[in-house]
Curated annotation (Swiss-Prot):
Residues 329-351 form a propeptide. It comes from Plasmodium knowlesi (strain nuri). This is Circumsporozoite protein. A lipid is attached at C328 (GPI-anchor amidated cysteine). The keyword Cytoplasm applies. PROSITE patterns: TSP1. Residues 50-266 are annotated as: Disordered. Gene3D superfamilies: Thrombospondin type-1 (TSP1) repeat. The lineage of its organism: Eukaryota, Sar, Alveolata, Apicomplexa, Aconoidasida.
Length: 351
């Protein structure tokens, strides 16, 4: 029995030794957690289903069939409830007002303030402007009435209707958010107020520039259309942010490279101690690493110091390079498992 226990323990150590030997940097605690059995991840969903089935079948005796009448009554009640529920017809909540059609050959009348433009009938025409009058587009929600004799019809303001100006009258400027009236015959068109819309210029008139947030309509007959002011291109904020991010990343990468370079530079004290130990054996070839596991250094002579005496070697005569060996934990696991296996085999064979 004692020999059997020793063989079992030695076999466990042997199995633990194999992956550690082939994969040098295996963590022993992680391997134990993988090989161990975890009782915390038990799936309890099936247990709940079994408990529900057991509680459902607990009410009837052995060999007793479930009552079918109760189930049928419940189904009938559900069907009746479904039939009694009235079906609501799908109604369109957005009801649009009806548009009256004009008579045959009739003209299209103008709607009131904020009204909608009715559809013209067969052969109906849109009311034309007066003599030499031009008909511009109506504003948002506004209707365009006909212009007077010799007057030009401007664009209507937001939600309002645009009246026609008198012959030869001067056009005043509209207030903030107000409506812009039409200019008289050969009258000059003033600039629209803040938020106002720019009306069309009169016959022979010049088209002024639109005010703040104003829209530029088409010029009237013989009117000159000024070129809009050149827009200044705004650089995309994403591009600026991207440039800043690239600059920050470049700076961070530069600093990281400097840190890595500084970390890889061997310590001068470590180099001097290692040189003091192997001074007589330093040649133009790289020496072994100063450590068996972890981070160390190795040195060699430069070309001009090949024939120099070992006692006269200085740091200027040597090339130093950092070296990295296997982790000490992996080597310790290999050694400890090997020693434990050997001891157990000796005890099992000689007892």
């Amino acid at each position: 029995m004692k020999n059997f226990i020793l063989l079992a323990v030695s076999s466990i150590l042997l199995v633990d030794l194999l992956p550690t030997h082939f994969e040098h940097n295996v963590d022993l605690s992680r391997a134990i957690n993988v090989n161990g059995v975890s009782f915390n991840n038990v799936d309890t969903s099936s247990l709940g289903a079994a408990q529900v089935r057991q509680s459902a079948s607990r009410g009837r005796g052995l060999g007793e069939k479930p009552k079918e009448g109760a189930d049928k009554e419940k189904k009938k009640e559900k069907e009746k409830e479904k039939e009694e529920e009235p079906k609501k017809p799908n109604e369109n909540k957005l009801k649009q007002p009806e548009q009256p059609a004009a008579g045959a050959g009739g003209e299209q009348p103008a709607a009131g303030a904020g009204g909608e433009q009715p559809a013209a009938g067969a052969g109906g025409e849109q009311p034309a402007a007066g003599a030499r009058g031009e008909q511009p587009a109506a504003g948002a929600g506004g209707e365009q009435p006909a212009a007077g004799a010799g007057g030009e019809q401007p664009a209507a303001g937001a939600g309002g209707e645009q009246p026609a100006a008198g012959a030869g009258g001067e056009q005043p400027a509209a207030g903030a958010g107000g409506e812009q009236p039409a200019a008289g015959a050969r009258g000059e068109q003033p600039a629209a107020g803040a938020g106002g819309e720019q009306p069309a210029a009169g016959a022979g008139g010049e088209q002024p520039a639109a005010g703040a947030r104003g829209e530029q309509p088409a010029a009237g007959a013989g009117g000159e259309q000024p070129a809009p002011a050149p827009r200044r291109e705004q650089p995309a904020p994403g591009a600026v942010a991207g440039d800043g991010a690239r600059g920050g990343n470049a700076g961070a990468g530069k600093g990281q490279g400097q840190n890595n370079q500084g970390a890889n530079v061997p310590n001068e004290k470590v180099v001097n101690d290692y040189l003091h130990k192997i001074r007589s054996s330093v040649t133009t070839e790289w020496t072994p690493c100063s450590v068996t596991c972890g981070n160390g250094v190795r040195i060699r002579r430069k070309g001009h110091a090949g024939n120099k005496k070992a006692e006269d070697l200085t740091m200027d005569d040597l090339e130093v390079e950092a070296c990295v060996m296997d982790k000490c934990a992996g080597i310790f696991n290999v050694v400890s498992n090997s020693l434990g296996l050997v001891i157990l085999l000796v005890l099992a064979l000689f007892n």
